[in-house]
């Protein structure tokens, strides 16, 4: 029989830099999960993606064991890296803070496709384009 899931914890952590300090320790500790085991496993899985924030979804079972799924980095992080900017515009209507090309947009859409609620690259590109526009990043040909 399958184990019963007690809790699902969602965190966004730096790739390869999870440690027992907050926010990881308290979030996992209250469910009785072995914090160091999670940190070691997460760091091992994400060490090749250094510099990105990687969202993780941790399923905690009755017997205090756990499994986790790593997601793709947030679109905003991928867009800021591609545009070479520190952060998006405070007010996107006031003007552009940077720009990315269509090919960069397609690359980001391909990366994000498994986590987006769409099936084609074209629709994924539209979703990412909307995110970029809201951040004050313009799309160039």
Swiss-Prot record:
GO terms for molecular function: large ribosomal subunit rRNA binding; structural constituent of ribosome. One of its GO terms (biological process) is translation. The keyword Ribonucleoprotein applies. One of its GO terms (cellular component) is cytosolic large ribosomal subunit. One or more lysine residues are methylated. The keyword rRNA-binding applies. Part of the ribosomal stalk of the 50S ribosomal subunit. Interacts with L10 and the large rRNA to form the base of the stalk. L10 forms an elongated spine to which L12 dimers bind in a sequential fashion forming a multimeric L10(L12)X complex. This is Large ribosomal subunit protein uL11. The gene is rplK.
